Amino acid sequence: MPSINAQLHHVNVTVPKSAEDAAKHFYATVLGLREVSKPEESRGRGGAWYQLGGMQLHLSIEDGLSEKCLSKRHICYTVNDLSVAEEQFRRAGVEIIPDDLPTRGWARFYVRDPGGNRLEIAQAV
């Protein structure tokens, strides 16, 4: 079967309207992602788009979501210094969720954004 040469362009996470401002602060300020302009036809829908290296994270508003949609599904962000990242999250008042299943070659912890989305923060060791 021939390859379709698929590449990851963006990941979309959703939060309830009530968490939109806190989520924007979380991704732009706490995580340090660079916000990019959305296409005009998407601007009236709320949320924000962020550039992350060669891909994007799209933050969308979804009606009917509970305040915390707890699940183990997650997006993994790699960092150069896990202890610096952990301290930055703690200073921002973000709860650190310890790694409950250590994986050889990686040090990591988890956090949740204001909409309840789970993020893995990892460093190769």
Residue ranges of each PLM-predicted region?
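Short, charged/polar, Gly/Pro-enriched secondary-structure boundary elements
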Residues: G54-H58, G116-L119
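N-terminal beta-strand motif that seeds the catalytic metal site of vicinal oxygen chelate
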Residues: M1-K24, R73-I75
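Hydrophobic side chains in well-ordered alpha-helices
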Residues: A23, A85-Q88
